[in-house]
């Protein structure tokens, strides 16, 4: 496995790659940096995100069951600067909002699968399991608005 850490205004973000695809994104620093094609694309995409150009797009592979993949696919459709509620997503798949939250918490590719854009129906933030937690979620949403 290869990895690359990028320093951002929100701290370090590290991508881990295997077989040419990103398999994990973490909000911390890894001291072992590689420069594979997919990691370089990740870094460019991250830099574009922080220039407020667009959402993050890169090749990744994520494991999950059928409903997880459907929910994660729906999260990818939430545009930069917008949010959806756990309930809105839950209705589409006939599952509970809590189940959507659990699926968000299992997301190994935050930013590309923007679980930070999912909030409670009352407008409060809900949870965020990435390092930095709810404070980081709030910063990301503020940055995107």
Which residue stretches match the model-derived regions?
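Basic nucleic-acid-binding alpha-helical/helix-turn surface characteristic of O6-alkylguanine DNA
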Residues: 1-95, 143
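Generic structural "secondary-structure junction" signal
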Residues: 58-64, 120-121, 127-130
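Structural signal for hydrophobic
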Residues: 75, 115-116, 140
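DNA major-groove recognition helix of helix-turn-helix
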Residues: 104
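The DNA-recognition helices of helix-turn-helix-type DNA-binding domains
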Residues: 107
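Short Lys/Arg-enriched helix C-cap and helix-to-coil transition segments
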Residues: 111-120
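…primarily DNA-binding HTH/wHTH and HhH modules…
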Residues: 124-145
